[in-house]
Amino acid sequence: MARYTEAKCRICRREGAKLFLKGDRCYTDKCAHERRPYAPGQHGRIRKKMSDYAVQLREKQKTRKMYGILEEQFRDYFKRADMQKGVTGENLLSALERRLDNTIYRLGFATSRNQARQLVRHGLFTLNGRRVNIPSLQVKVGDVIEVRERNRQSPIILEAQQVIARRGTPAWLEVEGEKLKGKVIALPTREDVQFPINEQLIVELYSK
């Protein structure tokens, strides 16, 4: 599947927000967005007044790039969220949070969503005892995710465990660090999305 090849720090600077795309680096003073909080390029420091449409578009771009999702797939998530009962924007964020790669990132078994996606594809995890390699799988309450026995001493996994101490675990997940095991104990709510997303702007964009 196609993925972004642009430098991750440039993406954060363009979107005007820290998207935590570089793992541990994002939690240090080396973060490019912290050091240069303006868009990349010769005219990056110039702030342009944006139309309502541009603001909505930027919010959608920021959200899908944070979760590492391409446009067509993101649109499918929105369509399903719009068909469900409840608030469309909150349904959308809940579905994005329940992706397997994001869940693994939230559990602290990877330093970034992109790394989590790669680790899933390489089969480093089991879901309810079965090996999985599909990052977009939707987890549900009661699901148990574990690092496979043969991969528990992987330097990547061990490094991620150090990062989670600074990041914390969201309330909808339960993690047993020593066993490298996590469990989904609730569905993620709007409050569990620890990132400044205005999902209503996305709803307005797709409702045009």
From Swiss-Prot:
<comment type="similarity">
    <text>Belongs to the universal ribosomal protein uS4 family.</text>
</comment>
<keyword id="KW-0689">Ribosomal protein</keyword>
<comment type="function">
    <text>One of the primary rRNA binding proteins, it binds directly to 16S rRNA where it nucleates assembly of the body of the 30S subunit.</text>
</comment>
<comment type="subunit">
    <text>Part of the 30S ribosomal subunit. Contacts protein S5. The interaction surface between S4 and S5 is involved in control of translational fidelity.</text>
</comment>
<keyword id="KW-0694">RNA-binding</keyword>
<dbReference type="Pfam" id="PF00163">
    <property type="entry name" value="Ribosomal_S4"/>
</dbReference>
<dbReference type="GO" id="GO:0015935">
    <property type="term" value="C:small ribosomal subunit"/>
</dbReference>
<comment type="function">
    <text>With S5 and S12 plays an important role in translational accuracy.</text>
</comment>
<dbReference type="GO" id="GO:0003735">
    <property type="term" value="F:structural constituent of ribosome"/>
</dbReference>
<dbReference type="InterPro" id="IPR022801">
    <property type="entry name" value="Ribosomal_uS4"/>
</dbReference>
<dbReference type="InterPro" id="IPR018079">
    <property type="entry name" value="Ribosomal_uS4_CS"/>
</dbReference>
<dbReference type="InterPro" id="IPR001912">
    <property type="entry name" value="Ribosomal_uS4_N"/>
</dbReference>
<dbReference type="InterPro" id="IPR036986">
    <property type="entry name" value="S4_RNA-bd_sf"/>
</dbReference>
<dbReference type="GO" id="GO:0006412">
    <property type="term" value="P:translation"/>
</dbReference>
<dbReference type="InterPro" id="IPR002942">
    <property type="entry name" value="S4_RNA-bd"/>
</dbReference>
<dbReference type="InterPro" id="IPR005709">
    <property type="entry name" value="Ribosomal_uS4_bac-type"/>
</dbReference>
<dbReference type="Pfam" id="PF01479">
    <property type="entry name" value="S4"/>
</dbReference>
<dbReference type="GO" id="GO:0042274">
    <property type="term" value="P:ribosomal small subunit biogenesis"/>
</dbReference>
<keyword id="KW-0699">rRNA-binding</keyword>
<keyword id="KW-0687">Ribonucleoprotein</keyword>
<feature type="domain" description="S4 RNA-binding">
    <location>
        <begin position="98"/>
        <end position="161"/>
    </location>
</feature>
<protein>
    <recommendedName>
        <fullName>Small ribosomal subunit protein uS4</fullName>
    </recommendedName>
</protein>
<dbReference type="GO" id="GO:0019843">
    <property type="term" value="F:rRNA binding"/>
</dbReference>
